[in-house]
Amino acid sequence: MTSQKLSLQDIILTLQQYWANQGANLMQAYDNEVGAGTQSPYTFLRANGPEPWHAAYVQPSRRPADGRYGDNPNRLFQHHQFQVVMKPSPDNIQELYLGSLEALGIKPLEHDIRFVEDNWENPSMGAAGIGWEVWLDGMEVTQFTYFQQVGGIEVDSVTAEVTYGLERLASYIQDVPTVYDLDWGNGVLYGDIFKEPEYEHSKYAFEASDQAMLLRHFDDFEKEATRLLDLGLVHPAYDYILKSSHTFNLLDASGSVSVTERAGYLHRIRTMARRVSKVFIDERAKLGFPLLKDDDLREIYLGEHGKYTLTEEN
């Protein structure tokens, strides 16, 4: 708890201003269903290849299996993450993070802030890295990750990802008993906005979804993603990979897939994720990696014997 009880809206605005001052470009939430801010193309795709990338954005994240009809004080079908990606990772990224807490009125020297080792992996997306959970006075509020692999490809430049759980952070700052009691802003409560959708999405995920339709959709989305990748259309293909992932999560939440089938679906998603990462790098290389300004790095990656130098065989 802090002496200044910022609304959730004020927390977002403060984090946006803070990270913009650190050089992050403020992006908008991606307009597709994702399970975490990591799945946004502003993180997943941009972590591939050698180009620098600094961004921050709020991302609504849907996890059908976590829905609880609005009855659980802090477990949600949809929650909100504030995502920061810094590539290459600044040497002082942890200090920058602590500075963001101070901007929110949380003075590090007055609180028990612990970095608890928690190496991260998302098998379905072929992504992994070393990381830490950040605990604030006993509550996990942030996940830190240094990406080592994305889409099954070892990264060229380490991306630091800082993911704030906005509901958890706001619950700590405002000291409220449930997420639905949070002050979103201007006297409007979190529950006024999200409790009814939370109930309805939970009912859909667990009771009302059309399983046969979802199974057909998964196959269709996979076929379309594959077709688009054959055409080199990375971003439309990635949209269909995200749709495949969300459709699988709905099937999984309702218990419609067996343990064996589950492994098969995850493998299919992982195969698409690995391919889109490779095609993304290839397409950026064809453009000459326009965000890569450093001459020495350009020589390493695009010089005569560079890692991504195009040849007739390419």
From Swiss-Prot:
Name of this protein: Glycine--tRNA ligase alpha subunit
UniProt-listed HAMAP family: Gly_tRNA_synth_alpha (MF_00254)
Location in or out of the cell: Cytoplasm
Organism: Leuconostoc citreum (strain KM20)
Enzyme class: ligase
CC annotations in GO: cytosol
Subunit structure: Tetramer of two alpha and two beta subunits.
GO biological process terms held by the UniProt record: glycyl-tRNA aminoacylation
